[in-house]
């Protein structure tokens, strides 16, 4: 059996944890499996490298930043190979150039385009554990690129798809996917399994276990994922195609504090102005989530929308630079907000879900600023200091602690 395993930075943050992961790998080798391991940079290595760069230059180029921070993953895979070799097992570390993994040119947020599996397959045939750097690739000019948030998860799924692996295991510091963040909800329940679509919505609404890009790729190539803890030996959560077509239940509630609300005030109420505004943001690769347009008055309207806090300053800059072109009066930005979402199959056939969610928020004295809905998700924007009360109340209202 060919298994792709991915370990995050916290799982390899210390020498003891590196040896713990090495022992887990050895267990699978002893069982006769071929193993490919994707590793993130250890602990806070990436943050430290970014800080060092900004000491030298507050506005470093994205190309050089990718060159710098990619060294964190190279340290991880080399140290793991050294550890396994010291324990008597064959292992080889490969970076993105050696695999190779090809991406587009978008430094700091590249997309994987193709993976050559010949080198990895040859190393597996030689009996090696293959350790691959996560989070990075190379573009057509042989420059190093990084994949942005969730890049190591995405690397693991892409390798599993390319190698036609039998299993793809994502190891984290929690035991699986829960109905809510256990830090907020003490009786949050671990899910045995969840469908791609629901996991994708949870990932994109604040659940930190898997990144949405990783889930998108898993769904596209039908790669079944197993989310496990690297610290505790226990069954995890399987993420796969949902076969329960008529299932109507809430899978979980998630909160995302990496949100900012931007409002563009006094836009002329005429065709094309919203297109112009969002087209400007699109050209800067700024993703927009919840959108609210006010009722027009005196020939103008206000448009509010949410972006990640990472993109908020860039979004405000772009809009302020184009205020006259848009015909708008002002731009405001609020970062003291958060998005709380419930996710579950069959919401459109169960109209009571929205009412129950809003009742839970009312009971917790939580004010709603914006609302967004889809077939399997309802999201609200609230004050960030009310997140815990909101999540706890919603989890209790839907009795998510009970196994359905």
How would you describe each model-predicted region?
Residues 214, 224, 241-243:
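Membrane-embedded hairpin module used as a gating/binding unit in multi-pass transport
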Residues 218:
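Acidic-aromatic/histidine active-site loop/patch
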Residues 40, 230, 293:
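Conserved H-loop
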Residues 223-234, 257:
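Active-site C-terminal subdomain of aminotransferase-like
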Residues 167-171, 225-227, 289, 370:
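Short hydrophobic alpha-helical runs that function as membrane-insertion/retention elements
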Residues 1-215, 382-383, 402:
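Nucleotide/pyrophosphate-binding catalytic subdomain
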Residues 56, 236-404:
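A conserved regulatory-domain signal marking ACT and ACT-like small-molecule sensing domains
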Residues 33, 89, 223, 286, ...:
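Short phosphate-binding/catalytic loops that engage adenosine nucleotides
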């Amino acid at each position: 059996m060919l298994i792709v395993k991915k370990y995050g930075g916290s799982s390899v943050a210390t020498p003891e944890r590196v040896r713990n992961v090495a022992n887990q790998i050895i267990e699978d080798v002893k069982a006769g499996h071929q193993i490919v391991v994707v590793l993130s940079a250890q602990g806070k290595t990436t943050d430290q490298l970014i800080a060092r760069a900004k000491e030298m230059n507050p506005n470093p180029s994205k190309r050089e930043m990718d060159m710098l921070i990619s060294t964190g993953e190279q340290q991880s895979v080399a140290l793991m190979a050294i550890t396994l070799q010291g324990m008597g097992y064959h292992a080889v570390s490969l970076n993105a150039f050696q695999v190779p993994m090809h991406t587009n040119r978008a430094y700091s947020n590249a997309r994987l385009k193709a993976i050559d599996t010949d080198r990895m397959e040859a190393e597996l045939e030689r009996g090696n554990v293959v350790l691959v750097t996560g989070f990075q690739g190379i573009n057509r000019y042989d420059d190093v690129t990084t994949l942005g948030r969730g890049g190591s998860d995405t690397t693991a799924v892409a390798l599993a798809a390319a190698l036609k692996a039998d299993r793809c295991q994502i190891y984290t510091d929690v035991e699986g996917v829960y109905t809510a963040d256990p830090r907020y909800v003490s009786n949050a329940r671990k899910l045995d399994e969840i469908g791609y679509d629901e996991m994708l919505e949870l990932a994109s609404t604040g659940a930190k276990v898997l990144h949405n890009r990783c889930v998108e790729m898993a769904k596209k190539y039908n790669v079944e994922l197993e989310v496990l803890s690297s610290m505790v030996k226990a069954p995890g959560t399987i993420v796969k195609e949902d076969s329960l077509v008529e299932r109507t239940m809430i899978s979980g509630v998630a909160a995302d504090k990496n949100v900012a609300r931007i409002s563009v005030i006094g836009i002329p109420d005429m065709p094309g102005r919203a297109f112009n505004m969002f087209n400007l943001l699109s050209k800067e690769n700024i993703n927009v989530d919840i959108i609210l347009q006010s009722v027009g008055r005196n020939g103008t309207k206000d448009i509010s929308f949410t972006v990640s806090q990472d993109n908020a300053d860039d979004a405000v800059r772009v809009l302020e630079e184009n205020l006259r072109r848009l015909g708008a009066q002002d731009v405001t930005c609020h970062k003291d907000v958060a998005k709380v979402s419930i996710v579950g199959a069959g919401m459109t056939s169960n109209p009571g879900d929205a009412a129950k969610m809003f009742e839970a928020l009312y009971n917790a004295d939580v004010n709603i600023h914006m609302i967004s809905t889809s077939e399997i998700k309802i999201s609200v924007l609230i004050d960030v200091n009310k997140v815990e009360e909101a999540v706890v109340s919603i989890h209790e209202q839907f009795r998510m602690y009970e196994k359905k």
